[in-house]
């Protein structure tokens, strides 16, 4: 009888141990199961703000959300939509498991508090804040401490600050002034018009075309260079405090593409190079090499009457 009782007790203890181990394993499995950092409806996101020590960048979808075009809010300028969408996709795919800290006192140490976070990301749908992400210090290569707004839990995730630049110009669509499918260009001394697949070139008094006998063929390289420069035009930054450009040299071109017509003003002043288009109030900087290509191409197409007379005499 005592033996049976002892065996029964031992069996009960074993069952308790097995149940405990099973419960512990299940609890560990649930704890290690990854879950999304932000459980929100990402398809409704239409505004993102990125705040750092350098300021705040606000990005929003245009009036037509279906267009998918992101803009720099406040400036009304096109942003790099692919870059914004890639960032949102990274945030959507952020998965977390076991936190490295769970109390508020750890936030400043990991730089995920409101004051010291290296990036604060606010994600909106209309006026509603869907979620906030605070990104802090790096515990290792391509890793960041991260915290969801409103939560004390701190996690480590794979994320790089290089994917979340803090400046407006980092998100600006640098090709926003590029002119594609151009069919007419008018400069100070010439008019270039596309007719079918060919171009017609004429001069404006008092200048005359170089190689006037066959102007398009003789100026083909300059024409192609000018068209290419307009198509590949890239800005490098925004000018908040506009300088006095009255003393600088300016190249003005009236450009037509289908139903769109623009006046470009390219200027050089004190070693800096600026471009502005008449459909925008913003003054942009752009590369010296691009300025020189446009200025040179537009000047090479024509020559003054005196220059042409000299060339004729030499011939």
PLM regions with names:
Residues 1-315:
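Secondary-structure "cap/kink" motif recognition
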